[in-house]
């Protein structure tokens, strides 16, 4: 189609192809590009370098950006030969000029008109997929209504605009039907390398990201930056819209479903704590122990878990680092456990308990202290009235004070009242 193609850059070569196809067929072209930003994400903030055509050393990220800019500029030059162009990717890269040559692209990321363009809605599930739902229900020995509820809990919960239409992850949902089991299919496909690098920059800030309202500019229009992880985490599908405040035009962001929450928190915990065993598996065992009411076993399990964390991670040099490690470690542990049981955050006028876990048989109130005493922790539970909301509850309320040593990095004292 193109003569002397070796002498043309990518953009011009692509433009010539579009022109020739139009001329030979008499029809304008439709161009679909998936993961348009992958060449940038793969090397973003990696610091990797290469030699350019002139022998100069440049960042691979900058080199790839230049190639993409030239390639995508072809769409403007070939406008007369195009019927429709659709690009999908994780990021907009609005401030890195990849699309500076584009002819007014339309961003439909949060457009109500297109909020259901990806995924499977509950209405579509009920109308078209009840046969595989019924087959799964039979395997799990539940009725179809319960099976739909389980599928929603595991794979539903995505929202892409203020319209708040619930969407299932189609990859996970269809794999569940095909494999005839509920599992973490999307997360098992592998974690992008750019996300791993991002998490290494932002460990202690992740507990502040979820369950909060943000302006659209905070997570949609941004410059890809490892120091600002929110937008990348949201646009990668690990967070989604869970609420909309029309008055202030702000969006509540949180995990979409159980699959993503379990996978993401486990990824963060494994990456941060550097333990050899999967923390999600550990969390399942802890939940089973709590549900059995065996607190002595839970203490042994948690003590062993902390001991498995490399000493260099547990032993921080300054007080601020020790305090931050202590709080973030317990945050990760109980955030993982909340995937499998009820973890409540009931705030009193005097404050909020470190952790309250509800099971069908009992309520467990935990208070943690760094280099304090278990009696101090138990006294705080009483003085702050953390058990007050359960005064009329028929379940027994068990109060546990736990002391974490900054010197050893493990549990030093454990006492129940």
Model feature map: region roles:
Residues 1-322, 337-338:
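Phosphate-binding site recognition
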Residues 20-25, 336-360:
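Active-site metal-binding core of divalent-cation-utilizing nuclease and nuclease-like domains
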Residues 30, 362-364, 398:
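Structural motif
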Residues 39-41, 94-100, 374-377, 407-413:
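Switch/connector loops and helix/strand junctions flanking conserved nucleotide-binding motifs
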Residues 53-66, 370-387:
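Mg2+/Mn2+-dependent nuclease catalytic core
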Residues 70-78, 231-239, 328-336, 380-400:
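Metal-dependent nuclease catalytic cores in nucleic-acid-processing enzymes
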Residues 330, 353-370, 384:
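Conserved catalytic cores of phosphodiester-cleaving nucleases, focusing on short active-site segments
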Residues 389, 393-417:
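Domain-level recognition of nuclease-like catalytic cores that cleave nucleotide substrates
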